[in-house]
């Protein structure tokens, strides 16, 4: 008899047909913000897609009640997440210093990566920026995890306003956000910039991770590896569809050629799960999260994930 398990996840092609051995999934497809809010606040499902930033924050606390597995359903390069007001005069990353910059949440994964690359690739001093926190399009968004901000960094909460409104009215000079708040991108032609960044660093930013509620994991620890294997199999079929030239599996022209070119750069498995294929990205993220006060200490990558998923048997 299979184990019944509830899972909240976005409707990804690479999770299509997900059938982990020994598990009957009850899948809930929700908008990302609702999913993260409900799982962070109420732990409504046995397993959930989760913000990587919030995950490392929770894992840095004593006795965390979640257990991540190294499945990364969403990855996005984040040079494209930096937006500037049209009349701000900001032309380079260093121009952000001394300016008012909005964020939806300091612990938003996209922002952690963007601030990390601004700091480490372009020499931007985060403490020299005036940070303002608000919802992207709606007032009232709040931080959902505990922060230990680095020296010199302060954040002004703006609960009655939105980032989009403040950017449009000139009350903010820039916004770092996973969603478009308006304005223009600092890196206007961002694709070649992000491609060179990947070639240089091998960092392919991980946005989301799959986590289990700890009581669910502790009761049946085998589900961690079975879920990982199930996700890997679903992803393998998705990647085959992406490079298929005989059919249009996704309504986008030249998709197979785009996938072929990306595979030439990133390797045969161009969307890897597991720890070792993602080590440059994972090490960079735990460093950024600690430097920016999302975690009070730098986490060890291996300590983030269920032990059963850290190694494989060999014949």
Label the model's feature ranges.
Residues 27-38, 91, 129-165, 300-310:
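Short helix-initiation/N-cap motifs at beta->coil->alpha
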Residues 274-315:
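Long, low-complexity C-terminal extensions of enzymes
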Residues 211, 217-291:
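Secondary-structure end/capping motifs
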Residues 63-65, 185-190, 311-314:
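Short low-complexity, flexible loop/linker segments enriched in glycine and/or proline
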Residues 142-243:
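Pocket-lining segment of extracytoplasmic ligand-binding domains
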Residues 6-9, 13-127, 131-138:
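Short, glycine-/small- and polar/acidic-enriched structural segments
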Residues 1-3:
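Basic/polar N-terminal segments that are highly enriched at the extreme N-terminus
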């Amino acid at each position: 008899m299979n184990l019944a398990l509830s899972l909240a996840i976005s409707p990804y092609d690479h999770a299509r047909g997900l059938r982990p051995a020994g598990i009957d999934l009850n899948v809930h497809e929700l908008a990302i913000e609702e999913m993260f809010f409900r799982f962070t606040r109420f732990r409504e499902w046995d397993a959930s897609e989760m913000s990587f930033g919030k995950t490392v924050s929770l894992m840095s606390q004593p006795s965390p009640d979640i257990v991540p597995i190294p499945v990364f359903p969403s990855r996005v390069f984040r040079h494209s997440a930096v937006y500037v007001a049209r009349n701000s005069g900001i032309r380079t990353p260093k121009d952000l210093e001394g300016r008012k910059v909005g964020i939806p949440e300091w612990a938003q994964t996209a922002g952690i990566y963007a601030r990390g690359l601004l700091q480490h690739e372009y020499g931007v001093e985060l403490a020299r920026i005036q940070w303002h926190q608000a919802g992207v399009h709606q007032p009232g968004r709040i931080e959902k995890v505990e922060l230990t901000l680095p020296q010199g960094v302060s954040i002004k909460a703006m609960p009655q306003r939105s980032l989009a409104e403040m950017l449009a009215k000139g009350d903010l000079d820039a916004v770092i956000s996973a969603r478009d708040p308006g304005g223009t991108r600092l890196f206007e032609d961002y694709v070649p910039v992000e491609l060179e960044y990947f070639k240089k660093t091998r960092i392919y930013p991980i946005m989301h991770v799959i986590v289990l509620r700890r009581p669910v994991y502790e009761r049946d620890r085998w589900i961690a590896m079975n879920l990982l294997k199930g996700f890997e199999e679903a992803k393998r079929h998705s990647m085959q569809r992406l490079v298929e030239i005989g059919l249009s599996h996704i309504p986008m022209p030249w998709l197979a050629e785009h996938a072929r070119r990306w595979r030439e750069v990133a390797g045969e498995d161009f969307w890897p799960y597991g720890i070792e294929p993602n080590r440059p990205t994972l090490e960079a993220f735990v460093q950024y999260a600690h430097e920016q006060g999302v975690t009070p200490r730098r986490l060890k990558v291996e300590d983030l994930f269920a032990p059963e998923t850290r190694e494989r048997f060999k014949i």
